[in-house]
Regions:
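C-terminal regulatory/oligomerization modules of transcriptional regulators
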Residues: 114-151
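Helix-turn-helix DNA-binding elements, focusing on the entry/boundary residues of the two helices
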Residues: 36, 54, 92
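N-terminal helix-turn-helix DNA-binding core of bacterial DNA-binding proteins
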Residues: 11-45
Length: 151
């Protein structure tokens, strides 16, 4: 089963929750842990907003643990994070290759578009873009982190 097909089995999170999941995945990958205070900084929101959102995410089974340092993505949360990251990176490639945007402009533009991409469109983007493994900035797609582990 392809990644987009796997991702569509669970109900899709809201764009706000997708943003949290994406940021939490990056924190876990880069820092080894998800810390609520750091999450508030990265998301640009008040700590109280993060606390409320984490409660909702726990209720909806995107994460486990809601204490300040015991936050972990569930398998469903990780799959959803990978999905939005993949859609974001595919959109960046589309903006570079098709729309000829400079790479430094693609991140913000992709962020506006990533939440609207359906699994069907994601499959088509993967096909058209020849199944990329790295984004235009050189970051690995989820599942391809081994490509950059020695950098």
């Amino acid at each position: 089963m392809s990644q987009p097909e796997k991702s569509k089995k669970a109900s899709r999170p809201t764009p706000t929750i997708e943003d949290y999941l994406m940021t939490m995945h990056v924190m876990e990958r880069d820092f080894g842990e998800i810390v609520a205070a750091r999450l508030a900084e990265l998301m640009g929101v008040a700590p109280a907003t993060v606390t409320m959102t984490l409660r909702r995410m726990g209720r909806d089974k995107w994460i486990t643990g809601q204490s300040r340092r015991e936050i972990h993505l569930t398998e469903t949360g990780r799959d959803a994070a990978h999905s939005v990251i993949r859609r974001h990176m595919l959109t960046e490639w589309l903006l570079v290759k098709i729309f000829k945007l400079p790479i430094f402009e693609t991140h913000d533009e992709a962020h506006h578009i990533e939440h609207a991409i359906s699994p069907k469109l994601e499959e088509r983007m993967i096909e058209i873009l020849d199944n990329p493994k790295l984004c235009p900035h050189g970051n690995p797609f989820p599942g391809h982190e081994d490509l950059t582990k020695d950098w």
